[in-house]
Amino acid sequence: MLKLEMMLVVLLILPLFYFDAGGQVVQGDWRSDGLARYLQRGDRDVRECNINTPGSSWGKCCLTRMCGTMCCARSGCTCVYHWRRGHGCSCPG
């Protein structure tokens, strides 16, 4: 019974190393690219950001799974996850 309990504890704790508290992938994780592609499919794609804090690179308006509470400062940009580089803005031309 002790082995089963220990195995359950390990299985519950192990995923915590792959994700931070916000549900976002920890940078440098080998699984991050697949999760980023999953989050960008269909209706899970991030919504357009609105300027919240002029003059700063991030505001607090994009409450999506991918960018958490971060948002791009420019209008028309979207918050994206770049494999091995983390979260950033994708802005039109």
Curated annotation (Swiss-Prot):
The modification 4-carboxyglutamate is found at E48. Keywords: Acetylcholine receptor inhibiting toxin, Disulfide bond, Gamma-carboxyglutamic acid, Hydroxylation, Ion channel impairing toxin, Neurotoxin, Postsynaptic neurotoxin, Secreted, Signal, Toxin. Coiled coil: none annotated. GO terms for molecular function: acetylcholine receptor inhibitor activity; ion channel regulator activity; toxin activity. Residues 25-45 form a propeptide. Alpha-conotoxins act on postsynaptic membranes, they bind to the nicotinic acetylcholine receptors (nAChR) and thus inhibit them. Through its two C-terminal domains, this homodimeric protein would bind to two nAChR allosteric sites, located outside the nAChR C-loop of the principal binding face and at the adjacent binding interface in a clockwise direction. This toxin specifically blocks mammalian neuronal nAChR of the alpha-7/CHRNA7, alpha-3-beta-2/CHRNA3-CHRNB2 and alpha-4-beta-2/CHRNA4-CHRNB2 subtypes. Hetero-, homo- or pseudo-homodimer (identical sequence, different post-translational modifications). Belongs to the conotoxin D superfamily. The cysteine framework is XX (C-CC-C-CC-C-C-C-C). Displays a mini-granulin fold, a structure composed of two short, stacked beta-hairpins connected by two parallel disulfide bonds. This newly described fold is derived from the same cysteine connectivity as knottins (ICK fold). The name 'mini-granulin fold' comes from the structural homology with the N-terminal region of the human granulin. This is Alpha-conotoxin-like Ms20.2.
